[in-house]
Amino acid sequence: MPATVICPSRAEEKLLRKQGFILIAGLDEAGRGCLAGPVVAGAVIMPPRLKGDWVEMVRDSKVLSPAKREYLYCHIVSMAVTFGVGAVDNEQIDSMGIAPATRLAMKQAVEDLTCQPDFLLVDYLKLPDIPLPQKGIVDGDALCFSIACASIVAKVSRDRLMSKLDMEYPGYYLAKHKGYGTALHVECICQKGISPIHRRTFAPLKGMIDGL
């Protein structure tokens, strides 16, 4: 049987609005486990009332096709109160580690918003460097509407960036796998070597470097 795809709920947002919070931002990241490129975060504040068939199509970005992500991205950014994007490159990731880099990207995304949120709904993480009320939700991108929207913004933003990097670093097929550790990507690294945008502290790249 195919796996059941969870429909994100707006229950968290409704509860927070009853408590007096108005500008509720969802946050999520894309590219955390990749071998190349940045980790990218999206922050989105959606209005309480939304109309259109697209609203019921919102899901965790990981279960959507590229075409559907692009379609939903256009609706999300056009209907959002505000949205922001943050990115931390591979050199910073290698220097500070992926968890701090992810938190930094999320902080940048919040700072990119045109108005300050009064509450953050975050996929999994807690963000101690952001002095705002917040809640980390395990599997938040699948369960919470605002976080699911943020996951789509982060994923589409990163995918577009990786397609641009594909032109700068041809032969790695970055536009195809977006920097994830696919068999094709690893084969390209073995043939062409490690590029300036690869994460040198990530396996199997670290093992390749240590073996030189």
Curated annotation (Swiss-Prot):
Necessary cofactors: Mn(2+); Mg(2+)
GO cellular component, one term: cytoplasm
Cofactor binding note: Manganese or magnesium. Binds 1 divalent metal ion per monomer in the absence of substrate. May bind a second metal ion after substrate binding.
Compartments where found: Cytoplasm
EC number: 3.1.26.4
Domain RNase H type-2: residue ranges: 22-212
Predominant subcellular localization, coarse grouping: cytoplasm
Transmembrane helix recorded as keyword: no
GO biological process entries: DNA replication, removal of RNA primer; mismatch repair
Residues that coordinate or bind a divalent metal cation: D28, E29, D123
Superkingdom field: Bacteria
InterPro entries hit by this protein: RNase_HII (IPR022898), RNase_HII/HIII (IPR001352), RNase_HII/HIII_dom (IPR024567), RNaseH-like_sf (IPR012337), RNaseH_sf (IPR036397)
Signal peptide range in chain numbering: none
A GO molecular-function descriptor: RNA binding
Keyword line: Cytoplasm, Endonuclease, Hydrolase, Manganese, Metal-binding, Nuclease
Role according to the record: Endonuclease that specifically degrades the RNA of RNA-DNA hybrids.
HAMAP family for this protein: RNase_HII_B
Family to which the UniProt record says this protein belongs: Belongs to the RNase HII family.
PANTHER family reported in the protein's UniProt record: RIBONUCLEASE H2 SUBUNIT A, RIBONUCLEASE HII
Name of the molecule in the record: Ribonuclease HII
Organism listed in the record: Dehalococcoides mccartyi (strain ATCC BAA-2100 / JCM 16839 / KCTC 5957 / BAV1)
Lineage, opening ranks: Bacteria, Bacillati, Chloroflexota, Dehalococcoidia, Dehalococcoidales
